[in-house]
Amino acid sequence: MGHSHSTGKEINDNELFTCEDPVFDQPVASPKSEISSKLAEEIERSKSPLILEVSPRTPDSVQMFRPTFDTFRPPNSDSSTFRGSQSREDLVACSSMNSVNNVHDMNTVSSSSSSSAPLFVALYDFHGVGEEQLSLRKGDQVRILGYNKNNEWCEARLYSTRKNDASNQRRLGEIGWVPSNFIAPYNSLDKYTWYHGKISRSDSEAILGSGITGSFLVRESETSIGQYTISVRHDGRVFHYRINVDNTEKMFITQEVKFRTLGELVHHHSVHADGLICLLMYPASKKDKGRGLFSLSPNAPDEWELDRSEIIMHNKLGGGQYGDVYEGYWKRHDCTIAVKALKEDAMPLHEFLAEAAIMKDLHHKNLVRLLGVCTHEAPFYIITEFMCNGNLLEYLRRTDKSLLPPIILVQMASQIASGMSYLEARHFIHRDLAARNCLVSEHNIVKIADFGLARFMKEDTYTAHAGAKFPIKWTAPEGLAFNTFSSKSDVWAFGVLLWEIATYGMAPYPGVELSNVYGLLENGFRMDGPQGCPPSVYRLMLQCWNWSPSDRPRFRDIHFNLENLISSNSLNDEVQKQLKKNNDKKLESDKRRSNVRERSDSKSRHSSHHDRDRDRESLHSRNSNPEIPNRSFIRTDDSVSFFNPSTTSKVTSFRAQGPPFPPPPQQNTKPKLLKSVLNSNARHASEEFERNEQDDVVPLAEKNVRKAVTRLGGTMPKGQRIDAYLDSMRRVDSWKESTDADNEGAGSSSLSRTVSNDSLDTLPLPDSMNSSTYVKMHPASGENVFLRQIRSKLKKRSETPELDHIDSDTADETTKSEKSPFGSLNKSSIKYPIKNAPEFSENHSRVSPVPVPPSRNASVSVRPDSKAEDSSDETTKDVGMWGPKHAVTRKIEIVKNDSYPNVEGELKAKIRNLRHVPKEESNTSSQEDLPLDATDNTNDSIIVIPRDEKAKVRQLVTQKVSPLQHHRPFSLQCPNNSTSSAISHSEHADSSETSSLSGVYEERMKPELPRKRSNGDTKVVPVTWIINGEKEPNGMARTKSLRDITSKFEQLGTASTIESKIEEAVPYREHALEKKGTSKRFSMLEGSNELKHVVPPRKNRNQDESGSIDEEPVSKDMIVSLLKVIQKEFVNLFNLASSEITDEKLQQFVIMADNVQKLHSTCSVYAEQISPHSKFRFKELLSQLEIYNRQIKFSHNPRAKPVDDKLKMAFQDCFDQIMRLVDR
């Protein structure tokens, strides 16, 4: 309970168990004239065997005769049942006369006596705290064994549950305490939704004021004691009808029709008006007036109850949705206390007291201590000890930093870990651990408070129910995705709390919207270490943020590590050393940035031609060894030294101005190479390029003009901006022509045009390379070779994996043809030291920049204020989101490694193991300008090593999440080990405009994707790209949903047909294993170019998804037509002789049952489109229909009992009511 924190919770799970009114089989009759005799009969009947026989355990032969849903008319009534009851309080009091008042003197109920114990029904959901209390759902039936001394609690045995699933069946027979006012006798009218008991005429009109025509309720008459009144709303007015009783104890409104029970009367008038102004259609929901007061514990009811006259309220400390927190004075003990007051009608009392019920069992020096409660009258209080410094969040923000050195911060964190370790050992979860919910007392003593969301775990995990809400930025991924919580979920929240403490109260994930947090976490991003944070503390944060709960430490281990850190006495020295490094790097980086700014300003005085050059400069504005200022929350060298001990580079992470984004964890640090290496090497090329002032520059794409101007900080003059734009537009046509003329479509490709916001590709170059190699001009075009390489890489990535290795002109430029420098492939171009690539990635993981999250196309927000950011970030925004890209290992170690033949042989061996790794996806917005051209077939291998890296690293992030994997939808799971890198990409990419745009050209491009076999020169194309996922033009694979794959399989036909065609096209296969894999797994199929007709036409993705399930919306006409079909089948079925069991009859039974099931599912969808009142009745009818359908379906068994005529009538009656409701 935070003094300055909101006392209200996001939501309380106790409200999530909302369910429909229970189904009861027993009717209710009117009261006798004498109250005493009526109560005596009621108690006797509640113990009678007749009532005890009617339960969910009742045989179908008894339950099958219900003609309609039981909310209005419980069947199976007889003359012995009574019509009504007095108030529930009288019933409880009378029922308790035979019980033992003192709990200590209560007798043990034997099996024989428990069978005669009174049967009660739960009116509301009750969630017991601890093992002594019995949790109930609304509608559950219990037998009362006894009461405590003040009758506030009763000990009950669970007799039956509303749901007869396996988990509930195991609970039958459990014994525990429940509040007396949460249950009512089985024959009580309180179980009906429409019965409101003793309410006034004006109250009934107020309740029906929010209803519609047909809304009604039944109440006790104010003027005629012992009789009832129906209040019904029609055309904006409320009409009241008294229910009369004749000499034979029958109830009626008009003399024409009379009834023995109130339930029968209400049901009749729900079908026929018969004197009422309209039908009784929509029962008005009643307030939970019965959920009144009860003591905190059944065994010690007065232990925590305090006299509110002893408490003097002082100033208000904080407030929230559900109540306020005050500073108070306790006169008896002469001490200051904190009082948490519940606002009237803000939340149910039992939910408010659940927090106190948990706190009373917790006693630890680092947990806020409960002193008592005041629950006898409103407002209700929870009283705890007073913490003078308020909550931890505000304390960190307002306190002078000099008073909170690092050693004090770590001590605070250690105290919190100690308290959480105590909760962990006692199987409690907090679920709302944050700085705002921790309180600070004198001498920096910290205690955990606010247990409103805390729960006791009977198993290893606790699952919150649908609709529960929690603080997103503090909740673990399994809690956000599946509402599953454990102590390891609190460990995740502790990592965020530790980050709050280290930043003196800053909000986590700065600049990230709540809707984007889960996407960042799922794709490996984590927050950077705070500035000056010691590596050991940041390491602990990252351990708490492991994706798999099993990989996170326990609180006792966290507490042990923090205590060791405190005792080491080296914490302050580490912090000072870290800050000194950061300051030195910042000074050096500022100096370099100022030089770049001066060059940029000097260029602004040149012509529009030079403006375009300067726009290119924004893509390559760093020198070979940049030192970027280490701003807040930037991962520094020491921050990640425990991840990569072999790191020797001194380059820090790149960050633009504005709030940073979380970096990936240690398994996912490789993507950061893309920007750091590009920034470090492209600067030399950019500077040389400026001095050469070549005329053949890339034109400004129309859609990137504003981005380019914004990136330069608005320094481009307006006139020059317009001239540059117009000049670029004039050059677009000629530039396109030169692009199309190039054999590979990459000779004149534009980086600014080819790479969109969602591009995942760049060309990282190692620092050790001589930058002069990349600034020489190509003899054919006179253009900068380095720029041509980048364009070529980005261009050819969209065509085929074979083109990944074509840009070796820097190593052996003479091998390129004069006509098309990048057009042909040859064996000399395969010069990649594969085995050194991982080492390079590992050695550069610390110097790489933090990946910038992609735009909203990938469901991650992008900083709007990145003016000083290099344009190279535009080309790498998705880096790190989907795992390391294969650009990491491309052309990295060309100069370092000279053993090309060995590398080539090693590469071929590697290819044979990795040739089925799926392509990756790069959403490029300008794919429409990229033609597909023929490629040389002389090469025997395919460069797919980067795919292996991507799949491997992505698997590291998610392969240990076994508790969560089965919850994931198909589109988020890996189809096999080699395709784990495609996890969750389709979910983000579905909303991407860029992805949708590039998908238009997939049909044209996919059949032309060449792929070479490692064991021959036969040129084949994959015919099952629809299985691995739709291949984007850039060469990546998108994971498909299950219904997409199913529809594609249907179009493909059987596996044997496809395999036979492939065998005809490729008659000679060298490896039997491949042939076996071809027939076994569709994802491994390969065919020749002649098999293009096997590939089905690509549908529009939106149509494909929506059309597969919701081809047409559920309409009233659809339901009516289905009803007519079932009606006809029903008539035909029962026209057959009942004794005749033929195959025809059996088949008709199954067909009709299936159609009824189809009707049930269709109506369930239709029910969501109608008014809430109609939905209530609709669902009741559907539930009844399902029961009848089940009974009829199994009645076709020759050994089964033949269908009774009453069941037929009941089914027909229920069926007719559904038809009337649909028509109405």
Swiss-Prot record:
It comes from the Eukaryota. Residues 311-562 form the Protein kinase domain. One of its GO terms (biological process) is defense response to Gram-negative bacterium. Residues 194-284 form the SH2 domain. It is an enzyme of class 2 (transferase). Gene3D superfamilies: Nucleotidyltransferases domain 2 (1.20.120.330), Phosphorylase Kinase, domain 1 (3.30.200.20), SH2 domain (3.30.505.10), SH3 Domains (2.30.30.40), Transferase(Phosphotransferase) domain 1 (1.10.510.10). CDD domains: PTKc_Abl, SH2_ABL, SH3_Abl. A motif (Kinase activation loop) lies at residues 450-474. Belongs to the protein kinase superfamily. Tyr protein kinase family. ABL subfamily. Interacts (via SH2 and SH3 domains) with mig-13; the interaction is direct. May interact with soem-1. This is Tyrosine-protein kinase abl-1. It comes from Caenorhabditis elegans.
